[in-house]
């Protein structure tokens, strides 16, 4: 074998010498010269050392002179093709041919109108070989002015956007245009040349025209290669491309190709090429250019393209990397990724594919979305992006208005019931049958009616700009009556506490400490007061009391702290939202501590304890506390009774005596002629606050807690549209659909699943 190699080398040298002599001998025969040149090309291609030897014997210089001097186009084409193939196989031949004289000769052939298309194509081929991977060649092609000639050919070779490649002349022109495009690519990159990149930026308007008018793969592939190499690692070139509208054109082409990819496989492959080009445009300026991408919803387009089954791992890597650059420092694109179920796709790429590059790209995308995911988890339900913000705002306004109307109707019903109760009390006072030695309760009734008036009118809605400015209230001085009412209330509270069998173990620890569990609420004061003094009380209807209301309110600083009604007026007026009439006086907008404190600081453990420590509660929190206290009392009764149940006969008799004694004690303290206002206790609990309704204590005689059936809410047209759109984009991920769209409050994932299956079965089932 070793002896054969020198023998073959010697034979190759002999062949090249003979071929060079034949080339010189057939100077007058163009066809023979063409055949000799093709044979030289074949010998040099089989052996890389043949080009070096052919250069040493002067063969390269002879072929260069032949290409210059020959008048036959056929010989020139063969000579240029042979030079290009020898330079392509051997780098030493490439360096020896890389001279300014040869570049000038090639430029002359390209600018000569007598040169045919095939000769120009061979000249471009030689330029391509000399410039490729050769910084010296890139410099010469710029200094000689050859790059300007190539740019002009790029603009003018193909004049018609509608390519008819079946026509031979059009096909030859297309091959020349494609060679020019490839030569420009090696002029700007491999290695990267910033100066040549800036010169090629002048072609961006022409490139945009081609992309907009011709969507054929034969045009898009070379143009995308040229754009990608021209923009690579050059911020200034990227800015020029975006300012010329190139990024918008690429986005439009990508969207069109993705929509066509469902029908043709080639469109999906072509969309990946456009994706790489777009990624090269935004790599170094992702923060500045990703806003343009969000306008065309490129992230959702890339996610849809990623699901195409025909793509391999390298193509999917290019798509995921482009998604990473789109979502970097752009919250709109990050939100679009979350909305279109992009995170599960990234996690799937991490787990299912074993490609290391693909895993790194998916990790890059997840890292970009880490910040916005944390924001959404902290403020779930607050959507501040695009169209969803307007829709959610309209829905919240409608719900708030509906709640205000509901609260106003409830308060109107309560006013009517109190007026009816006031008329009955007036009749009872006139008959003179209800008398008692307890002090007058006139002030308490007026205070209750005063609160109801504030409920009906919604209080005053005007807010003072200066918070420290106190509002003047028209009043008279009922200090003595109010102190008596407070003492009365404390006596009733003590009496009830002594007769309550549930609290035998609760003892007063001091006069300064208030036991909030036994404090009566605003709505229960009238239930606990049994009789009215006929001498002290004046028979008035609710209308008369309301007329004198402006004169019965004292300055807020002078009202005793024991009055629980005036403290909640402003909270009720904020809930109802009705402006006060001129007869109602302006009051300060006080709220209880439960309303002021941040909700993040409260939880199910410290909420009850915190409200019990408040000196005042609003109607909202009073109802909550009453329902909770009533529920706890029932539990304590059950616990005490269960603890006292024994099988010993003597203890059983003792238990019966205690229960009998407690019942008698209740009868003694309850007046036989006392009469509660109708429906007052029910109205105290029946408020517009959903929390109080949900925590209402069970009916006596029923054991345990019973779940309430949910109120039926029919699906609106918007919800049905949300449901179908969510299934189309996310599949049967009901929980994701539930949190992605603004469904009504109380909707669950299982409700969406059942509704969707009913809608699929038919309209008759969907009505259910």
From Swiss-Prot:
The modification Phosphothreonine is found at residue 648. SUPFAM superfamilies: ARM repeat, Homeodomain-like. Residues 707-760 form the Myb-like domain. Residues 524-700 are annotated as: Interaction with TERF1. GO terms for cellular component: chromosome, telomeric region; nuclear envelope; nuclear inner membrane. Disruption phenotype: Mice develop normally, exhibit no overt phenotype, but are infertile (both males and females). Testis lack postmeiotic cells due to massive elimination of spermatocytes, while females show degeneration of the ovaries, lacking growing follicles and mature oocytes. Residues 399-448 form a coiled coil. Keywords: Chromosome, Coiled coil, Meiosis, Membrane, Nucleus, Phosphoprotein, Repeat, Telomere. It is found in: Chromosome, Telomere; Nucleus inner membrane. ARM repeats lie at residues 101-145, 341-384. Phosphorylated by CDK. Phosphorylation by CDK takes place in late prophase when the cap exchange is prominent. is important for the stabilization of telomere attachment but dispenable for the cap exchange. Expressed in testis and fetal oocytes. Its main location: nucleus. Meiosis-specific telomere-associated protein involved in meiotic telomere attachment to the nucleus inner membrane, a crucial step for homologous pairing and synapsis. Component of the MAJIN-TERB1-TERB2 complex, which promotes telomere cap exchange by mediating attachment of telomeric DNA to the inner nuclear membrane and replacement of the protective cap of telomeric chromosomes: in early meiosis, the MAJIN-TERB1-TERB2 complex associates with telomeric DNA and the shelterin/telosome complex. Belongs to the TERB1 family. This is Telomere repeats-binding bouquet formation protein 1. It comes from Mus musculus (Mouse). The gene is Terb1.
């Amino acid at each position: 074998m070793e002896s054969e190699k020198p023998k073959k080398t010697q034979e190759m040298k002999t062949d090249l010498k003979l071929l060079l002599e034949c080339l010189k001998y057939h100077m007058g025969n163009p066809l023979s010269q063409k055949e000799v040149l093709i044979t030289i090309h074949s010998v040099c291609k089989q052996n890389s050392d043949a080009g070096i030897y052919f250069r040493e014997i002067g063969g390269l210089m002879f072929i260069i002179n032949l290409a210059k001097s020959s008048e036959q186009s056929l010989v020139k084409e063969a000579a240029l093709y042979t030079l290009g193939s020898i330079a392509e196989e051997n780098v030493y031949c490439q360096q020896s041919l890389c001279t300014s004289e040869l570049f000038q000769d090639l430029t002359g052939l390209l600018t000569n109108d007598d040169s045919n298309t095939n000769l120009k194509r061979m000249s471009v081929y030689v330029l391509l070989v000399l410039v490729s991977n050769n910084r010296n060649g890139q410099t010469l092609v710029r200094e000689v002015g050859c790059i300007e000639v190539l740019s002009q050919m790029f603009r003018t070779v193909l004049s018609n956007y509608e390519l008819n490649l079946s026509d031979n002349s059009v096909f030859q022109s297309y091959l020349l245009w494609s060679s020019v495009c490839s030569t420009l690519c090696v002029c700007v990159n491999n290695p990267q040349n910033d100066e040549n990149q800036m010169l090629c930026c002048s072609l961006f308007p022409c490139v945009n025209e081609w992309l907009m008018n011709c969507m054929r793969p034969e045009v898009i592939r070379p143009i995308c290669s040229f754009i990608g190499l021209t923009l690579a690692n050059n911020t200034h070139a990227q800015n020029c491309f975006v300012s010329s509208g190139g990024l918008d054109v690429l986005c439009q082409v990508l969207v069109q190709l993705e929509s066509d990819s469902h029908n043709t496989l080639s469109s999906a492959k072509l969309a990946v090429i456009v994706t790489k080009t777009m990624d090269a445009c935004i790599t170094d300026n992702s923060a500045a250019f990703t806003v343009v991408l969000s306008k065309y919803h490129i992230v959702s387009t890339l996610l849809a393209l990623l699901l195409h089954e025909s793509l391999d791992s390298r193509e999917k890597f290019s798509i995921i990397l482009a998604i990473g650059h789109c979502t970097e420092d752009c919250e709109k694109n990050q939100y679009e990724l979350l909305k279109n179920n992009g995170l599960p796709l990234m996690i799937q790429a991490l787990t299912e594919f074993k490609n290391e590059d693909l895993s790194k790209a998916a990790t890059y995308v997840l890292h970009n979305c880490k910040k916005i995911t944390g924001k959404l988890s902290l403020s779930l339900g607050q959507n501040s992006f695009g169209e969803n913000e307007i829709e959610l705002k309209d829905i919240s306004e409608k719900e708030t208005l509906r709640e205000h109307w509901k609260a106003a109707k409830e308060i109107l019903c309560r006013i009517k019931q109190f007026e009816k109760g006031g008329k009955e009390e007036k009749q009872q006072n006139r008959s003179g049958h209800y008398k008692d030695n307890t002090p007058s309760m006139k002030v308490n009734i007026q205070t209750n009616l005063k609160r109801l008036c504030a409920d009906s009118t919604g209080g005053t809605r005007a807010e003072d700009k200066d918070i420290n400015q106190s509002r003047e209230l028209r009043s008279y001085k009922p200090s003595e009556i109010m102190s008596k009412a407070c003492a009365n209330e404390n006596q009733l509270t003590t009496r009830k506490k002594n007769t309550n069998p549930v609290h035998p173990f609760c003892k007063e620890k001091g006069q300064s400490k208030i036991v909030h569990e036994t404090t009566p609420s605003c709505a229960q004061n009238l239930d606990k007061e049994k009789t009215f003094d006929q001498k002290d009380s004046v028979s008035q209807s609710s209308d008369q009391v309301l007329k004198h209301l402006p004169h019965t309110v004292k300055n807020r600083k002078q009202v005793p702290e024991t009055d629980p009604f005036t403290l909640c007026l402003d909270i009720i007026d904020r809930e109802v939202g009705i402006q006060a009439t001129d007869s109602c006086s302006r009051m300060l907008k006080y709220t209880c501590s439960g309303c002021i404190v941040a909700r993040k600081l409260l939880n199910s453990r410290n909420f009850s304890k915190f409200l019990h420590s408040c000196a005042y509660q609003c109607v909202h929190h009073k109802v909550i506390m009453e329902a909770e206290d009533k529920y706890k009392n029932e539990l304590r009764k059950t616990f005490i009774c269960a603890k006292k149940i024994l099988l010993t006969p003597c203890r059983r008799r003792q238990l019966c005596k205690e229960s009998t004694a407690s019942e008698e004690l209740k009868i003694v303290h309850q007046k036989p002629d006392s009469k509660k206002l109708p429906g007052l206790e029910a109205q105290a609990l029946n408020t517009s606050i959903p929390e109080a309704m949900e925590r209402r204590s069970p009916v006596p005689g029923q054991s345990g807690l019973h779940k309430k059936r949910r109120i039926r809410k029919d699906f609106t047209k918007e919800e049905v549209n949300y449901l179908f759109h969510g299934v189309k984009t996310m599949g049967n991920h009901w929980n994701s659909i539930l949190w992605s769209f603004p469904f009504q409050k109380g909707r669950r994932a299982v409700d969406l699943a059942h509704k969707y299956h009913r809608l699929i079965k038919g309209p008759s089932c969907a009505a259910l």
